[in-house]
Structures are given as structure tokens and as C-alpha cells.
Amino acid sequence: MAETLSGKTPLFAGSTGGLLTKAVEEEKYAITWTSPKAQVFELPTGGAATMHEGENLLYIARKEYGIALGGQLRKFKITNYKIYRILPSGETTFIHPADGVFPEKVNPGREKVRFNARSIGENPNPSQVKFSGKATYDA
């Protein structure tokens, strides 16, 4: 997916936390969002920046920084952020939210993983499961 990312880089006041050399050589991440007004926000790597009104684009070294910055943006009621992985070849991959819905939200199409239709009190006795050959989550 060779998607072109657009937007202005936020204005930095002081330390930005910077990109690591590894981020340029191996891969880097980008987060994009749209802001209704210019406002100051905290960077996950330390420091602060001022986002522009309209589209914003910020390159970061790790996906976790993007997730943390998304948490900061939610304090400003900005929920339309997207995180991309950018490889040195220029290939851009959309990675968060992967299916268009944030993990903590309910999505009718999202399948349940390791779901058991029982309450905690109905769980089997661990001593009976231990040597039965079954995994505890399959019992």
C-alpha cells in the first residue's frame, strides 16, 4: 500500500525526543490526525508541541509512541487519528486501528478470542485439568 500521507508537522517548543537512527534505517511510524483548533499537547517522548488546525502529521520511532500520543489526543476529543508503519523502501502500511474500530470499542464483526461462555465460578478445578493433556483455556 503506497499511501501518501499529508498534513503539517506540529510546532515543537524545546526537546522533541527525536527519531532514533534505527527508525530511519529500519522503519519508522507516522501518526495523522485532524484538529479543530491549534492547541498544545504533550509528546510521548518528552517535551511539548503545538498542533495545527486541520491535518497534522508526526513521524515517530515506535508504534507505542503513537498509541500513547493517541491517548493524549483523546483528551482533546480527537479520535480520528491513524498510525502507519513506513519502511525504508517507502512502503506505507496502515496499522492502527487495524479494522477501523479501536480495540476498546465493540465491533459487531469482531470475533471473540478464547471466549468461554461461563462465569469464573464455573471454571474447572485446575488440579483436574493439569494432567489431562488439555490447556487450561481449552477446558
UniProtKB/Swiss-Prot annotation:
Q: Does the keyword NAD apply?
A: no
The UniProt entry's GO biological process terms, in alphabetical order, are: photosynthesis
Record keywords: Photosynthesis, Photosystem I
Locate the transmembrane regions by residue number: none
> Known SUPFAM superfamilies for this protein?
Photosystem I subunit PsaD
Instruction: Give positions of region: Disordered.
Output: 119-139
Specify whether Electron transport is a keyword of the entry. no
Which N-terminal residues, if any, form the signal peptide?
none
Q: List cellular component terms (GO).
A: photosystem I reaction center
Instruction: Give the function comment from the record.
Output: PsaD can form complexes with ferredoxin and ferredoxin-oxidoreductase in photosystem I (PS I) reaction center.
Q: Which family does it belong to?
A: Belongs to the PsaD family.
Mind telling me what this protein is named? Photosystem I reaction center subunit II
